[in-house]
C-alpha cells in the first residue's frame, strides 16, 4: 500500500525493513 492506495505489483520494487534481534518493527518503500 502506497499513500493509502494499493500498489500494483512491481511498481515499487525497492523496500526497506527494520529488524532488531530478528524482530520486525517497521517497513516502507523507497521512492
From Swiss-Prot:
Keyword Protease set for record: yes
The reaction(s) this protein catalyses: Preferential cleavage: Tyr-|-Xaa, Trp-|-Xaa, Phe-|-Xaa, Leu-|-Xaa
Residue ranges the record marks as coiled coil: none
Example GO biological process: proteolysis
Any Gene Ontology CC annotation: extracellular region
Molecular functions per Gene Ontology: serine-type endopeptidase activity
Chief location category: secreted
Keywords on record: Hydrolase, Protease, Secreted, Serine protease
Localization (cell): Secreted, Extracellular space
UniProt-listed InterPro entries: Peptidase_S1_PA, Peptidase_S1_PA_chymotrypsin, Trypsin_dom
Enzyme class: hydrolase
Pfam family, one: Trypsin
Annotated ranges, domain Peptidase S1: 1-31
Enzyme Commission designation: 3.4.21.1
Homology family: Belongs to the peptidase S1 family.
Identification of the protein by name: Chymotrypsin
Organism: Penaeus monodon
Lineage: Eukaryota, Metazoa, Ecdysozoa, Arthropoda, Crustacea
Amino acid at each position: 500500500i502506497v499513500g493509502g492506495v494499493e500498489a500494483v505489483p512491481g511498481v515499487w520494487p525497492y523496500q526497506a525493513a527494520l529488524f532488531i534481534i530478528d524482530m520486525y518493527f517497521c517497513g516502507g518503500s523507497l521512492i
